Amino acid sequence: MPSQRHYSPADRLLMQADAALRTLLPFSGQPSRPSPALLKTEAELSESEARHVAGLMRINHTGEVCAQALYQGQALTARLPQVRQAMEQAADEEIDHLAWCEQRIRQLGSHTSVLNPIFYGLSFGIGASAGLISDRISLGFVAATEDQVCKHLDDHLGQLPAGDEKSRAILEQMREDEAQHSTAAIEAGGLRFPAPVKFGMSLVSKVMTKATYRI
């Protein structure tokens, strides 16, 4: 049986830098799955509808940027190899969401948020800090974050124009994936965060959504 490769701290830092560039540079993330929107018919949206949907998808794209950074930060400081591997696998799966959202934003004639580098840095720091405290807290943070993302996606699904099948297909698949990530994190030993902590996280997420809807 081949032995598991052990990376040096320098190797891991280079891997983190590569992950950051693949997350932040346009069209650099290569999805492993085709977009759920691929076979859906493009709706005839009014200018205001297209602008609103683009704003929603921009929020979701930035949310995926934050998820990438969170997972990469946690993978850097995770104590147990299996937790580190789980974080890296989750980050790989989120690349699909990142690419799908960006594709849809471009189709709508809009742009990703210029604030993404800032949110990436903040989320990476939070993820690394959680990993330093304990793997249980790190996994619990993943579960709580994914629960927040699911709530945002439910809200956005309710705001989409009825005929926008492309955006709806993307968000529905993302919703399914994020719920699975949350469940997997708890089953792996993640701590269930109390309601006050989740409330604080929701306030922080509102800052992100307000800021990235337009810019």
Curated annotation (Swiss-Prot):
Xref: Gene3D superfamilies: 1.20.1260.10
Subcellular location: Cell membrane
Record's GO cellular component terms: plasma membrane
Family of this protein: Belongs to the COQ7 family.
Comment on bound cofactor: Binds 2 iron ions per subunit.
EC number of the protein: 1.14.99.60
Lineage top rank: taxon: Bacteria
Disulphide bridges: none
Binding site for Fe cation 1: 64, 94, 97, 178
Species this chain originates from: Stutzerimonas stutzeri (strain A1501)
Function: Catalyzes the hydroxylation of 2-nonaprenyl-3-methyl-6-methoxy-1,4-benzoquinol during ubiquinone biosynthesis.
Designated name of the protein: 3-demethoxyubiquinol 3-hydroxylase
Record's keyword terms, sorted: Cell membrane, Iron, Membrane, Metal-binding, Monooxygenase, Oxidoreductase, Ubiquinone biosynthesis
